[in-house]
Design a protein with these regions (language model features):
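Extended repeat-based interaction scaffolds and adjacent low-complexity, acidic/S/T/P-biased segments
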Residues: 1-58, 93-96, 108, 126, ...
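Signal peptide-proximal N-terminal region
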Residues: 46-48, 78-98
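Glycine- and acidic-residue-enriched helix-capping/strand-helix junction motifs
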Residues: 67-79, 227-235
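Beta-alpha junction/loop-to-helix N-cap segments that form part of ligand/metal-binding clefts
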Residues: 72-76, 91-167, 452
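Periplasmic-binding protein-like
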Residues: 121-135, 151-158, 218-223, 254-262, ...
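An alpha-beta-alpha
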Residues: 171-257, 292, 353-362
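Extracellular/periplasmic periplasmic-binding protein-like sensory domains
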Residues: 183, 298-404
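Segments of small-molecule ligand-sensing domains
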Residues: 380-478, 486, 491
Length: 497
């Protein structure tokens, strides 16, 4: 744990070697950190010629213990920060350095590392804030409180637990959150069950067998862990239970931590309310979400399959073709929540330089973001393979855009403030953030309300797990629409593609 802005790269060193896919992610994280540090050097060089330079801390759980796996989320965020650094260097305004801070496995060391960052900020007035934060857990909540007390701005990319940054009117003045809170996600899931699930139940039994029912007869919330310190899962489950009676026609949700036949049932909706962490050593080699899918495949016969909806905690699993291609998961179509619908709707455009250049030429949104990220992706695709495995992306990960927007908020704040003042300080950042809504690549970011939650758009989308080349379809935005214009192509139950 600790922080680094050059030289030292955080990586795993598992005794006896790692799974090839894990080793591949290690290589990706190592490459990303090295690229960030090279861009830091370039920022220093142009700052010597008079450009304003600001620093941000990227704070996440970058390493994992030997018994745990981690996925591409942290790499995606580092790559989003790289895009922000490069776009800034190509312009004429402020440039940005990124200090990488590691909170350890699952952010368990968030508090001591936060104290290190606070000490660093006391010595470095050009350090304007912290982005990332990785997990809605008790240690991260404590770290946010420490940053707030030290007047260090924080922009959390994916945190969503209710009250993670305090509760109104006592919410933390220096805390800002891009993702909607869990109460919003719970409402979207429940409205999806009320409005959209019946459309699937009305389809032929070849599409989904509901035993002749057109509404959910049972809602089961599967919560892999009841750890009260995991604020993401605990508040989401509480929200689902509390809000369900407000949705006419829905049965009262039941909560279980047990895997088995109780998950089965035609016209049963299983809500996966968890992450996709790997359990303690010796229990299973599968992550929690994969084990959930495997049990349903093994224990539920074809006329007894539940309708599956997963929270946004599985979005990184979905985005990893290798994870979806594991044996034993069956061929289920599942619905899941994404807070990256704006990027999902770009498809593969931002992954390939020719497509990104065409987007830039036509003046479409995301132009500079797309072209810069596409060049980074080509370097990632060229990384050495590990036992035949190479990196493969089908669309731009939502965390790439979230991290880019988080950094760009600080860059724009510096730019706007400098137009009529000297260089900005940390104390002025909140005032800049709340002054006006701001258009990011992930959507409209509006911190003008008292809660400092941008509430970027959530959507429920659908995907077939069995195919490593499948992409999400049938966007349900839950804003008075049945299905939105994207992403992808696929038959939706109202007949739209």
């Amino acid at each position: 744990m600790g922080y680094s802005d050059s030289g030292f790269v955080f990586t795993n060193r598992a005794p006896g070697g790692e799974d090839p896919l894990q080793a591949l992610q290690d290589e990706r994280l190592r490459f990303d950190q090295q690229q960030v540090f090279l861009l830091n050097q370039r920022a220093d060089q142009v700052a010597e010629n008079g450009r304003t330079e600001l620093s941000l801390v990227y704070f996440a759980g970058i390493t994992a213990s030997p018994d745990e796996n981690y996925d591409s989320g942290q790499a995606e965020e580092l790559e989003g920060l790289m895009v922000a650094q490069q776009v800034a260097l190509q312009g004429s305004g402020p440039v940005v350095k990124v200090i990488v801070a590691n909170g350890g496995s699952k952010m368990r060391e968030a508090v001591p590392v936060a104290r290190m960052i606070i000490a660093l900020a006391a010595r470095n007035p050009g350090l304007l804030g912290v982005v990332g934060l990785d997990r809605s857990i008790e240690q991260v909540k404590q770290a946010i409180g420490l940053f707030n007390a030290s007047e260090i701005p924080v922009v959390a990319t994916t945190l969503s637990a209710d009250g993670i940054g305090g509760t109104y009117p006592h919410n933390d003045h220096y805390y800002f959150q891009l993702s909607p809170s869990n109460i919003t996600e719970a409402g979207l899931i429940l409205r999806y069950i009320q409005e959209i699930v019946p459309r699937y139940f009305r389809q032929s039994r070849n599409e989904y067998y509901s035993a002749g029912q057109i509404q959910a007869r049972r809602i089961l919330i599967f919560q892999p862990s009841a750890d009260p310190g995991d604020l993401f899962t605990s508040t989401l489950v509480s929200d689902l239970k509390r809000e369900a009676p407000l949705f006419k026609g829905l049965p009262a949700p039941q909560v279980t931590q047990q895997l088995g036949t109780q998950l089965c049932g035609a016209a049963t909706v299983d809500i996966y309310a968890g992450r996709h962490d790997r359990p303690s050593a010796g229990i299973s080699q599968l992550d929690d979400f994969s084990e959930f899918l495997r049990i349903i495949e093994d224990d539920c016969h074809s006329a007894d399959k539940p309708f599956i909806i997963a929270d946004d905690g599985v979005s990184r699993f979905i985005a990893d073709p290798a994870a979806r291609d594991q044996s034993g998961l069956g061929e289920p179509e599942i619905s899941y929540v994404t807070n990256g619908i704006a990027l999902l709707n770009t498809g593969s455009r931002c992954l390939h330089t020719a497509a990104a250049a065409a987007a830039q030429g036509s003046g479409e949104p995301f132009s500079s973001f797309c072209t810069t990220y596409a060049a980074i992706v080509q370097k990632l695709f060229n990384l050495p393979k590990v036992q035949g495995y190479g990196l493969d992306f089908l669309w731009t990960g939502e965390r790439v855009g979230l991290a880019f927007d988080a950094a760009d908020l600080f860059i724009d704040a510096e730019t706007n403030f400098q137009s009529s003042h000297p260089a900005i300080g940390r104390a002025e950042i909140p005032g800049q953030f709340i002054s006006d809504p701001w258009q990011g690549v992930t959507g409209l970011i509006d911190f003008t309300t008292d809660l400092h939650i941008a509430s970027l758009p959530l959507a429920v989308v659908r995907i077939r797990i069995s195919s490593p080349t499948a992409t999400p379809t049938c966007e349900y935005p839950g804003q008075g629409q049945v299905f939105g214009p994207g992403p992808g192509t696929g038959r939706c139950p109202d007949g739209s593609d």
